[in-house]
Amino acid sequence: MLTARALVNKFNLQLVAGEEGLDRPIHNTDISRPGLEMAGYFSHYASDRIQLLGTTELSFYNLLPDEERHGRLRKLCRPDTPAIIVTRDIEPPEELVVAAKELGTPLLTSKDATTSLMSRLTTYLEHELAKTTSLHGVLVDVYGVGVLITGDSGIGKSETALELVKRGHRLVADDNVEIREITKDELIGKPPKLIEHLLEIRGLGIINVMTLFGAGSILTEKKIGLNINLENWDKNKLYDRVGLNEETLRILDTEITKKTIPVRPGRNVAVIIEVAAMNYRLNIMGINTAEEFNERLNAEILRKNEHKEENES
């Protein structure tokens, strides 16, 4: 559970009042700058957000008549308000200090500029409050692409990851991948602390990739872009031989590109995954070899049909 106390430590904030409220939970990633509330409009006050007060809000507050000041700031301090932060090292108004003490709302100060702190807070909250899940698989950084290798147990995921590491790529997680959906279409994968840097190879046991191959062979987390699903070769199944069939894997609310690779003796799966990662990067750049081949094929068929019609006439 994320609380205001964690923000104090993370962003070097100073506590002014409301210490008893430091353990209030934070559930909302949005941050408010209560300008309309300073003007007295509280009909849609987002009290469950962190409230940020900067030069603009406090300069307007100083223009208010004395009889309105205390009540205005008191309304900011709600039971579900995680914290009120005053930026730019501005001294909080005495009325706000009193209200925070009485109502137990954490009142904090920061030396940072308002916009800068708001940006950093938003990034931190999105990361910490992101939806999470875990998947059985291996996550490897291949040519800068986060490749999630999935498949049945014993199919060879870890062995493939080992081969990729030997070829200069970087291991992120083996066996269990913890995934956070930071924003829409952005999945970040990382290993559980217990098995960080470790790889399990059947018949060999558990190896420490960082110890064997060096610090350059591992990553602590990586954005997931491509899913490679390994399966035993089925001679009765028609596999995509051109690359026009687009599969996707849905993780939380995000869909990523999926490629199914049939496994059988003689196929170098690690090399295939390298090529898949490079091809994925080309697709992002707008270069699709399968579509280009299909266009050339259709053009050639059309040309031959026209030539045939001319000969018949």
From Swiss-Prot:
Active site residues of this protein: 136, 157, 175, 241
EC number in record: 2.7.11.-, 2.7.4.-
GO biological process: regulation of carbohydrate metabolic process
Binding sites annotated in the UniProt record for ATP: 151-158
Substrates-to-products reaction catalysed: [HPr protein]-L-serine + ATP = [HPr protein]-O-phospho-L-serine + ADP + H(+); [HPr protein]-O-phospho-L-serine + phosphate + H(+) = [HPr protein]-L-serine + diphosphate
Binding residues annotated for Mg(2+), in chain numbering: 158, 200
Domain notes: The Walker A ATP-binding motif also binds Pi and PPi.
Start and end residues of each stretch annotated as Important for the catalytic mechanism of both phosphorylation and dephosphorylation: 199-208
Gene Ontology terms for molecular function: ATP binding; magnesium ion binding; phosphorelay sensor kinase activity; protein serine/threonine kinase activity; protein serine/threonine/tyrosine kinase activity
Sorted UniProt keywords: ATP-binding, Carbohydrate metabolism, Kinase, Magnesium, Metal-binding, Multifunctional enzyme, Nucleotide-binding, Serine/threonine-protein kinase, Transferase
One Pfam family matching this protein: Hpr_kinase_N
InterPro entries: HPr(Ser)_kin/Pase, Hpr_kin/Pase_C, Hpr_kin/Pase_Hpr_N, P-loop_NTPase, Ser_kin/Pase_Hpr-like_N_sf
Region (Important for the catalytic mechanism of dephosphorylation): 262-267
Domain of life: Bacteria
UniProt lineage: Bacteria, Bacillati, Bacillota, Bacilli, Bacillales
Name of this chain's protein: HPr kinase/phosphorylase
UniProt subunit comment: Homohexamer.
Extra facts: Both phosphorylation and phosphorolysis are carried out by the same active site and suggest a common mechanism for both reactions.
Cofactor(s) the record lists: Mg(2+)
Its biological purpose: Catalyzes the ATP- as well as the pyrophosphate-dependent phosphorylation of a specific serine residue in HPr, a phosphocarrier protein of the phosphoenolpyruvate-dependent sugar phosphotransferase system (PTS). HprK/P also catalyzes the pyrophosphate-producing, inorganic phosphate-dependent dephosphorylation (phosphorolysis) of seryl-phosphorylated HPr (P-Ser-HPr).
Family listed: Belongs to the HPrK/P family.
